[in-house]
Curated annotation (Swiss-Prot):
Superkingdom assignment: Eukaryota
Region (Disordered) location: 1-69, 1137-1193
Name assigned to this protein: Nucleolar protein 6
This protein's record includes keyword Transferase: no
Localization terms from the record: Nucleus, Nucleolus; Chromosome
Gene3D superfamilies: 1.10.1410.10, 3.30.70.3030
Length: 1193
């Protein structure tokens, strides 16, 4: 169903594999024809007389081209059987097959790699032994002293391919070929295992080889850079980009320097040994104490020493096994899309390759397993195998005691073929658990028969930052040095060879894990790959910056209390609690009588947005209390975008007459429960009304606020003035009455009776409940506690009468039409969907606030309900929360908003039907039938198709239409979402930039509009939500006057403009208090002269030669006429920019004619000082009280 674009595939794999879809149809057709083709046909002997019997009609007519079709071969039958047994759909199998075909390396790259390796082998044979005295290159490592007297020994072994190039699993688009060059044993001495001597010699050896290569004419034009492998400063590698047309800079060669395993004594680098002495860093160590183990440094050296043996075993396992190679390719795509393989602590693809061999040796994977079986088995075993206890690939069996001893020194333990090196030495526990969770999710997606899981597993890019709820960034160099100096344990310093990053990671992870406890699910390092640098420059200092992502536990993250041990029962525990929390800890007495140490972070009455900052409070306090790190030196990202649905600071709450405890910092999310409680009380009063002709059996709130999806703050400020209710917003309520057979059968009479019934309800409410009410064209307006409710009456007979049509023959038929669909959606389907979304918010507390961010973003991009329906936004966000896109549910609205942008950016709207199966109301067959109908009749569905399980026969066509949103608007929104994601990702992953300000995302660009119509600001009330500014003009004095309830004049006028002039212009405005209307003209062909036709005269004017033409000037006059009193003036964006550049107040308050006169340049008048002949100095310009605002006086 869904083909989402990816960013890692070479070739044509950027969208839906059309070939796969066609192949799938053909394969299914062949599978269905096998039974007929296998049956032998009876032969008629020549001597037999012709049969006179009437032959039976063959319902399955044979095509002309299939008369000589051969029966399926054994291989085809096996493939069909595998499809039925392994894949839950033929489509999934075809998609996998198509992707693997696209991933296969082209022959030109294979040839180039072979030729380059031969050339490099010949080059190494020409190298000569010698003393390395001087070099014009910089050694890619921070050396303790300048290199003197390093003797270069010619390599005795030919260079060889390692990694993906050796196993045949290279993955684009940037093809990286890893080559190993073994440093001979003679280059190393007996004591080189100590104090980074081996690493320094390795770096010098790499520098020498690089210098000789640059002198060689074979590599003279190539580009040479150094880089750190896996962000490890002890692992410099040479990155060479060949300059040749054959590979066109799409290929890169990385040169690794290794050493033979026999270079040092066996057991020298076991995890419990020490190979970095404290004296190396100038530290003192008591000789009586055992030296601390340096397991991570030892594993770093063993990576080089065991590389040859490990690669030989991998080559043996993967050679000529296309199934293993393709399976590993699938796993690499899955891993890279989740960005779990980046950096020092990354889960590399070489680990997956070794795990495939491990499963094969354990007889869990077989040599005949398909690529899909390989990937699925690896995911299943990853999810269900615990590596923290240790697993081993060693050819020689390892005793359980020794394996346990290995595992004690690492978070994760996977022993290699030699039995000496831990492949997962640098992987922290939280990241390993994350890999397991992602693997478990992949298996669950594969097992879901209702879902096309292919795009979710392989095609959808899921960067790690979009999977976390909060992010902690520390980038101040001096602060990090201070933390490492004062708080990093010497044992950790020696273990990581004084590399700062893993020390920081260990220090912060342990502290936050203890402080946050059950509030946090995972603490993940967010890394970016280090950038390469020219070989002539010094190696950069890395590791002085860290970024951690926190995945929160929604059930516990926002608790306001940390309760410690009882002071009387556990004195030591209470003392430890006070020491850990510092001054925040206090002795408190609780309602159950217990007296314990406790830390309070807020109150139960705090708003949800404030509670979401509790984790932030805890983290900053821990950093300050334990690490002396000031909050100004830390960037904690979590809740920055909540500002966009806060109450405008221009509106003063203290002037509002209400009994509700409202603060100036309140927001739309915190105000929603007040409205819901008022609605619940109104519902009880309606149910309790006496003497009604019919009983009220159902009351449903259908406005967005009843499902926590209203982005504009709703305050209790509605008023009754001269029998009119003034309110900034109304809340819609639908009621249904008990059954009665006395309702009229004529539509007008039925609606009149409905009106009379609503008046009766209003009178009863006034008499029995003392509520004010006003009857309007849309329903009964009721004023209660400062809120305005619009009560509508639903009746089944009205819907039937709207569908009723009488044919020419007098036959009554019932046919759906736009009016009946609208009524059915509003009165019968929306109440059910609204209830389901309300329940979803109760399950996932971040749902409502995510919708608020999404709606505010779309509104600030000048997309109103006429271009993009609000319900479409709510249902798309609900789709995010319903589907298993990530192992954990979204706990922070900011994360939900980022995933919403990803959904808009990467979805194939033309190929996907967004299904919301509330309460599992749909059966599996119903979903399959709907998807089949969607695929076969795609043209009958709108561009954005969303279906819920309550839509009945309107599924996919009820919440959106062909024009809302149109294909163009969908493309526009997709581009906007991609741009917003680029801004967010750049700010998140940058070391220097701070997180985006809301105005960077929630303010539209002023580019691309032809004209801007400005409204009179005193007639257009401002939104109560936080004003982030207009894209066209600067801020102005806000207008919070209350309009007549339900009178959204601007929306109605824009609707009229679209209905009349959408063929000639597109209209954009911000529905949340926008005071400008952006206009984009259609292409010039719409305004070209055309022959006179009676049916095509709309907005046309005669232009001679019996032709007519649409004139933009005439259209503008029509626009002014429709806008009437709201129109102020029309300007181009360029004119508005020019006014702002000239530091003039944008002309929003005055008449356009006067504005034009005042905008003309006037000669400057200079005053003279009294008593002197000198001219007085001109007054300084004041922007607020400029001459252009005198019209207001």
């Amino acid at each position: 169903m869904r083909f989402v674009q990816g960013n890692i595939m070479p070739g044509k794999l950027v969208g839906s594999p059309k070939g796969a879809a066609r192949t799938g149809t053909q394969a299914i057709a062949h599978a269905g024809d096998h039974s007929d083709l296998d049956e032998p046909k009876p032969k008629i002997a020549k001597s037999d007389p012709p049969s006179t019997a009437i032959p039976k009609k063959n319902n399955f007519k044979q095509r002309e081209g299939t008369k000589n079709v051969k029966p399926p071969t054994l291989e085809e039958m096996k493939e069909l059987r595998d499809t039925q047994n392994l894949f839950h759909s033929n489509l999934f199998k075809l998609q996998v097959k198509e992707m693997l075909e696209e991933l296969q390396l082209k022959q030109k790259y294979t040839d180039f790699i072979e030729n380059w390796l031969e050339s490099f082998t010949a080059f190494t044979r020409q190298l000569k032994d010698g003393l390395m005295e001087r070099t014009h290159l910089e050694v890619p490592m921070k050396l303790s002293e300048k290199p003197t007297g390093f003797v270069f020994s010619k390599p005795t072994r030919e260079p060889y391919l390692i990694g993906a190039a050796a196993t045949g699993t290279l993955l684009g688009p940037k093809i990286v070929v890893d080559v190993a060059l073994e440093m001979p044993k003679e280059s190393l001495h007996k004591e080189d295992y100590l104090n980074l001597r081996y690493d320094q010699k390795r770096a010098l050896y790499l520098t020498y080889v690089t210098e000789r290569m640059m002198e060689s004419p074979d590599y003279a034009e190539d580009q040479f850079n150094f880089n750190y492998y896996a962000n490890n400063p002890l692992k410099p590698v040479l990155e060479l980009i060949p300059v040749t047309k054959q590979v066109n800079k799409h290929l890169q060669v990385r040169l690794f320097i290794t050493a033979p395993l026999s270079s040092f004594k066996p057991g020298r680098f076991v995890p419990w040994n020490n190979n970095i002495r404290p004296s190396f860093y100038g530290d003192e160590w008591d000789e009586k104490d055992p030296l601390p183990s340096t397991q991570h440094y030892n594993a770093n050296v063993l990576f080089d020493l065991t590389l040859s043996e490990n690669q030989a075993q991998l080559d043996k396992a993967f050679k000529s096994r296309r199934n293993f190679q393709d399976g590993l390719l699938l796993l690499k795509v899955w891993l890279r899309q989740r960005q779990l393989d980046i950096g020092y602590s990354g889960f590399g693809a070489h680990i997956l390759a070794a795990f495939i061999v491990y499963l094969n040796t354990q007889r869990i994977l077989h040599q005949s397993s398909s690529s899909y079986q390989v990937a699925r088995t690896v995911w299943n075993q990853l999810a269900n195998t615990d590596w923290t206890k240790g697993i081993s690939l060693s050819v020689a069996p390892i005793q359980t005691e020794e394996l346990n001893k290995f595992a004690e020194h690492y978070d994760v333990c996977f022993i290699d073929f030699t039995g000496q090196h831990n492949l997962c030495a640098n992987i922290p526990l939280y990241l390993y658990q994350r890999v397991r969770e992602e693997a478990k999710l992949a298996v669950e997606l594969l097992n879901d028969m209702k879902l096309n899981s292919f795009p979710l597993i392989f095609m959808q890019k899921c960067p790690l930052y979009s999977r976390v709820d909060n992010i902690l960034k520390i980038s101040n160099y001096s602060c990090i040095n201070q933390m490492l100096t004062l708080h990093s344990h010497p044992r950790i310093k020696y273990d990581f060879a004084n590399y700062g990053y893993p020390q920081l990671l260990h220090l912060l992870t342990e502290l936050l894990k203890k402080g946050l406890a059950e509030r946090v699910h995972s603490i993940l390092p967010l890394e970016t790959a280090t950038a390469a640098w020219p070989v002539e420059k010094k190696a950069p200092v890395i590791g002085k910056y860290i970024q951690l992502g926190l995945i929160l536990q929604p059930e516990h993250a926002y608790q306001v209390l940390n309760k410690g041990p009882a002071a009387n029962d556990d004195h030591e525990g209470a003392e430890e609690f006070r020491r850990f929390w510092g001054e925040k800890s206090n002795l408190r007495r609780f309602q159950d009588g217990s007296i314990t140490e406790a830390v309070v972070w807020g109150t139960a009455q705090d708003s949800p947005a404030k509670k979401r900052l509790i984790v932030r409070q805890i983290v900053l306090h821990l950093l300050e209390h334990h690490l002396q790190l000031d909050s100004k030196e830390v960037q904690y990202i979590g809740g920055e975008l909540d500002q966009v649905y806060q109450l405008s600071p221009w509106f003063k709450v203290n002037k509002l007459k209400t009994k509700l405890p409202l603060g100036q910092d309140t927001d739309a999310e915190a105000l929603s429960p007040h409205v819901i409680r008022c609605y619940d009380e109104l519902a009880r009063q309606l149910h309790g009304l006496n003497d009604l002709p019919l009983e009220i059996v159902s009351i449903s709130g259908v406005s967005p606020i009843f499902r926590y999806c209203e982005p504009q703050p709703v305050l209790p400020q509605a008023l009754l003035v001269e029998n009119r209710i003034l309110a900034s917003s109304i809340q819609r309520v639908v009621i249904q009455l008990g059954q009665s057979g006395k309702w009229p059968t004529e539509l007008g009479a039925l609606r009149a009776l409905k009106t009379a019934f609503l008046i009766e309800i209003g009178e009863k409410l006034e008499a029995q409940c003392r509520l004010h009410w006003v009857m309007s064209a849309d329903g009964l307006l009721v004023l209660k506690q400062g809120y305005c409710f619009l009560i509508e009456l639903a009746h089944n007979k009205e819907l039937a009468l709207l569908k009723q049509e009488v044919t020419e023959r007098g036959i009554t038929t019932y046919i759906d039409n736009a009016a009946s669909r609208s009524l059915e959606r509003q009165h019968y389907i929306l109440p059910k969907v609204s209830g389901a979304l309300h329940s979803l918010h109760q399950t996932y507390s971040a749902f409502g606030s995510t919708v608020l961010l999404a709606k505010r973003w779309l509104a600030t991009q000048l997309l109103d309900d006429g271009l993009w329906p609000d319900m479409a936004t709510e249902l798309l966000v609900a789709h995010l929360f319903q589907q298993r896109y990530a192992p954990q549910s979204i706990a922070a609205p900011q994360t939900g908003f980022i995933r919403f942008l990803q959904l808009l950016s990467h979805s194939d709207f033309n190929g996907e039907l967004f299904l919301l199966n509330f309460n599992n109301s749909w059966q599996e067959q119903q979903i399959a039938d709907l998807e089949h109908n969607y695929r076969s009749n795609r043209q009958s569905y709108p561009p954005l198709a969303v279906a819920t399980s309550y839509d009945m026969q309107h599924a996919g066509r009820l919440w959106t239409s062909d024009q809302s949103p149109s294909q163009r608007v969908l493309g526009h929104v997709t581009r906007l979402a991609r741009h917003a994601l680029e801004i967010i990702e750049t700010s998140l992953m940058s070391k220097d930039l701070r997180f985006v300000r809301p105005a960077q995302l929630f303010r539209a660009s002023n580019e691309g509009y032809d004209l801007v119509i400005q409204f009179k600001p005193d007639l257009v009330p401002n939104s109560l939500s936080y004003d982030l500014g207009s894209p066209f003009v600067s801020f102005s004095q806000p207008n919070f006057s209350l309009p007549r309830a339900g009178s959204d004049y601007i929306a109605r006028i824009v609707g009229l403009l679209r209905s009349a002039y959408s063929d000639f212009a597109a209209f954009f405005y911000n529905p949340h208090g926008g005071k400008e209307l952006g206009i984009v003209w259609r292409p010039p062909t719409e305004f070209a002269a055309k022959p006179f036709k009676v049916t095509e005269l709309q907005a046309c004017s005669p232009c001679g030669n019996k032709k007519v033409q649409v004139l933009k000037e005439t259209l503008l006059e029509d626009f002014k006429l429709l806008l009437k009193d709201f129109y102020l003036r029309i300007a181009t964006p360029e004119e508005l920019k020019r006014e702002q550049r000239e530091h003039q107040k944008p002309m929003r308050y005055f008449d356009a004619n006067k504005a034009e006169e005042e905008s003309k340049p006037k000669p400057k008048k200079h005053r003279q000082r009294k008593g002197t002949g000198k001219k007085a100095l001109p007054k300084r310009k004041r922007l607020i009280k400029s001459s252009t605002l005198k019209v207001l006086k």
